[in-house]
Structure formats: C-alpha cells, structure tokens
Amino acid sequence: MPKTITKEYVVYDLEDLKKDNELCDRIYQKFWIDSPDNINGWSDENIDSFKKFAETLNMSLDFSLSNAEYQDRGCYVKLIPDYRLDNKDYKEMLKDYKGNGYCFCDDLKTFTLKLLDKKEYKVLCEWATNDFVLEIQNKMFQLWFTDNEYYFSKQSFLEMVECNEYEFLENGRLA
C-alpha cells in the first residue's frame, strides 16, 4: 500500500524579512547576489538608450559592459564622433530628442545640453570634440554602473520582493 509523506516548510515573506535582518541578509545574499541568473532587468533598455543616443548624435558606439555592480578591466564605452558637426548641430539634434523613453535618454540629453552650454564646448575643434565625447562616454559608463549598483542593492531586492509578493524558504529559494 502506498504511503503519502508530507513535509512542512517554513515560508518567509516581506514582513518576516523586515523583522529579521539576519534572515533578510542571508536570503538577499543567496537569492539576489549569488544567483548567476540574476541580471539587471533594465540592461537591454540601458543599451538601447546608449545606441539611440549615439545614433541621434551621428556617432558610432562600441562598448563592453558587465552586468555586475562594478566594472572590470574589460569594460568600456567608446563613441566615435563626426568631426564635421559643431555645437549648434548637436543642440539641434537633441532639440526634440526623446530616445526610447527610458530614463537614461533624458539623463544623457540633459547632461549633453549642459556640456554644450559650457565655454570650452562653444566651438568644437578636434580636441574639444574629443573632450566633449569623452565626457559623454564617462557619463554613459557612470549611468550603467550606478543603475547596476542600485539594482543589486538590498533596497532594490526588497522592492522586488514586495511587488512580486515573493516568499522564501530558509535556504534562500523561492517558495
């Protein structure tokens, strides 16, 4: 005669995680940080924002970016400008720029327009264009890793637990 065996599991939800910091840290580490499948869900939109922005400014984009909180040696963003364009051209290109609607688009537009208002970028000779482009590259790099850093933060983890109503086993797996 077959037997039925049942096992009870203790399940933890958001309220449990908020009450027990040690439990929260353990599950956060196992489920969020250590999972090789956990990457920033917005990374594709971020890359699309960079591509659309570069395309709008008639620049070529080359990049290698990790999906981690911090860059490694192989990470870079490289923009290659059209040196025939000047300050007025770039401002005109950005005038009605919306990008793909993601926040990086507006951040890059605002940052670049502020750069173009600076004295050193009023006239874009080759060296000034190189400096101008370098500042945009650095901004893209900073936006990428700031977004990843936030995504992997404990605060972001707790927000995901709340909006998805996740419940966990003590070993850090979803219940």
Sequence positions of predicted segments:
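Alpha-helical propensity feature that highlights long, continuous alpha-helices across diverse contexts
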Residues: 2-175
